[in-house]
């Protein structure tokens, strides 16, 4: 009889357990669904972060390839400037230096061709409007012949590598002539 009571108690507990566990299961399902949604959201974020890291790494590698020559090219610019200055200062009519002058011209042409091949472009803005992003004004000079803020003279060419400024052009910029004030004699 004690065994029957134990079995009855177990049967009662078993009958009540499914009702309680049904509510518990529904709550548990709700919690698990929320956890699943959170895990899926987190997985999407991690995938997006991974994609962003890959994209940034690809961009960094591309920039490294594109601008790897920046320091080397910057170190070559004074050599090019010296060759150009030597040509400017030498007399083209002097027959005694003609072979040397031709050699410098050919060397300079080879330099320019090589620079062009690696997308290193000269900025020679003579006569163009002043552009503060590419030019550095070394002086201002009054001029009635050209528009104000135009480049009158280029002291040193600028250069850009793949569109990025490597060195600004050093220039003299025009300004409008000062208005002439009438002299005392003209006033009288």
From Swiss-Prot:
InterPro entries: GrpE, GrpE_coiled_coil, GrpE_head. One of its GO terms (cellular component) is cytosol. One of its GO terms (biological process) is protein folding. It is found in: Cytoplasm. Residues 1-22 are annotated as: Disordered. One of its GO terms (molecular function) is protein homodimerization activity. Keywords: Chaperone, Cytoplasm, Stress response. Pfam families: GrpE. It comes from the Bacteria. The keyword Protein transport does not apply. Gene3D superfamilies: 3.90.20.20, Head domain of nucleotide exchange factor GrpE (2.30.22.10). Belongs to the GrpE family. Participates actively in the response to hyperosmotic and heat shock by preventing the aggregation of stress-denatured proteins, in association with DnaK and GrpE. It is the nucleotide exchange factor for DnaK and may function as a thermosensor. Unfolded proteins bind initially to DnaJ; upon interaction with the DnaJ-bound protein, DnaK hydrolyzes its bound ATP, resulting in the formation of a stable complex. GrpE releases ADP from DnaK; ATP binding to DnaK triggers the release of the substrate protein, thus completing the reaction cycle. Homodimer. This is Protein GrpE. It comes from Pseudomonas fluorescens (strain ATCC BAA-477 / NRRL B-23932 / Pf-5). The gene is grpE.
